[in-house]
């Protein structure tokens, strides 16, 4: 009796496997559909759409990080929602409303903690990545009038199970250290500059750089030597004396490092600035079609792709990183919001919000490969981000 039973069990297992074929997650990604509060699961091997996940709330300024096994996407919604999406089962695994107005988050180096930055209530909440249970609640500095706490921006994971972020209203940067457990050690950097609005981490995880909305210049913290405090850099970076109208602030995560050069979107100017990655001094300025938003390097650093704010957001320009010449001026369609390279750079995916589509380009031939329908697409995120610090 035992042998037939084992045979039957084996047949049942094989049948189940046939119904749900095994696949990896390394080529998977997601597209945020901001108008419908939904998420598309995509795959780059065949440039196809796999599933649509609905019920994710307000995704008007959503961002996404991934678990270290690349199976789960954590979606930070503007309505304070934190949603864990299973990319293999095509469903919401867990969801919590953790605040009233969220502006992004990060996953710790070891993949165990999720930090969410909040405008309302101002502060950071940290969750267990498996269960989404609250681990720590760190309120931001109260305003002088006591009306509310400062708004949190630029939450980034840094090496050593740490998170770093800035406080827009009180001109501070805080470093949370969870390396000794779930009670963080907090280091506060005060007076970093007026109104930090976003931040980036250099690729090796050493420097945290905060952009300043209230004045020109930027604030840099050396995370190898946090005791040295804040250093002001790039005094000319900003709107300058002319105070040009800014249609959309560039994302500092849209900075890109290519060799010894860093390419930076200039605020309120039709220029991409080039900096020396060692001394943070400007070395060149490249005239472009409009106010740049994302400035992104192909993974081999040979090209720089740039998209723009309104009214030039139908265009994308490609810059040669060596000569600084514009080698292509593309018009993918109305309202190009975001771009994402596959991990090894063979494809460039971009979202065309008002064209209701995602486009896949070959960044070597500069040819359009495929168009895929989408509901007001914005952010595109591939699961390979799981293995990059600061994304």
Curated annotation (Swiss-Prot):
Cross-referenced InterPro entries: Cyt_cd1_C_sf, Haem_d1_sf, Host-pathogen_enzymatic-act
Major location category of this protein: cytoplasm
Localisation per UniProt entry: Cytoplasm
Domain of life (superkingdom): Bacteria
Keyword Repeat: no
UniProt keyword list: Cytoplasm
A cellular component annotation (GO) from this entry: cytoplasm
Role description: Required for the biosynthesis of heme d1 of nitrite reductase. Could have a dehydrogenase activity yielding sirohydrochlorin from precorrin-2 or dehydrogenation of propionate side chain C17.
Protein name, as recorded: Protein NirF
Species, as recorded: Stutzerimonas stutzeri
Gene it is expressed from: nirF
């Amino acid at each position: 009796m035992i042998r037939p039973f084992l045979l039957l069990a084996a047949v049942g297992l094989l049948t189940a496997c046939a119904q749900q074929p095994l696949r990896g997650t390394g080529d998977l990604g997601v597209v945020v559909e901001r108008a419908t509060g939904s998420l598309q699961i995509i795959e780059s091997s065949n440039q196809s759409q796999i599933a649509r996940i609905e019920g994710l709330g307000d995704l008007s300024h959503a961002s996404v990080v991934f678990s270290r096994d690349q199976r789960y996407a954590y979606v930070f919604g503007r309505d304070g929602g934190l949603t864990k999406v299973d990319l293999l089962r095509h469903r919401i695994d867990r969801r919590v409303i953790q605040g009233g107005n969220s502006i992004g988050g990060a996953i710790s180096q070891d993949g165990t903690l999720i930090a969410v930055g909040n405008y309302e209530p101002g502060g950071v909440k940290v969750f267990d990545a498996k269960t989404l249970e609250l681990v720590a609640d760190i309120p931001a500095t109260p305003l002088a009038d006591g009306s509310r706490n400062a708004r949190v921006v630029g939450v980034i994971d840094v090496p050593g199970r740490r998170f770093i972020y800035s406080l827009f209203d009180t001109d501070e940067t805080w470093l949370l250290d969870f390396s000794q457990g779930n009670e963080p050690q907090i280091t506060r950097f005060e007076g970093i500059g007026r109104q930090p609005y976003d931040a980036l981490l250099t690729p090796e995880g050493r420097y945290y750089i905060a952009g300043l909305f209230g004045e020109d210049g930027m604030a840099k913290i050396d995370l190898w030597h946090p005791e040295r405090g804040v250093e002001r850099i790039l005094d000319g970076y900003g709107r300058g004396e002319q105070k040009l109208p800014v249609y959309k602030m560039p994302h500092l995560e849209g900075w890109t490092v290519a060799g010894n050069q860093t390419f930076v979107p200039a605020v309120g100017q039709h220029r991409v600035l080039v900096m020396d990655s060692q001394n943070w001094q400007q070395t060149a300025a490249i005239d472009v079609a409009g106010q740049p938003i994302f400035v992104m390097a192909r993974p081999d650093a040979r090209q720089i792709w740039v998209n723009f704010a309104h009214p030039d957001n139908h265009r994308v320009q490609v810059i040669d990183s060596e000569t600084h010449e514009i080698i292509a001026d593309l018009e993918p369609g109305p309202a190009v919001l975001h771009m994402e390279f596959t991990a090894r750079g063979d494809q460039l995916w971009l979202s065309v919000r008002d064209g209701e589509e995602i486009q896949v380009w070959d960044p070597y031939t500069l040819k359009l490969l495929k168009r895929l329908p989408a509901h007001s697409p914005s952010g595109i995120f591939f699961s390979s981000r799981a293995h990059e610090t600061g994304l």
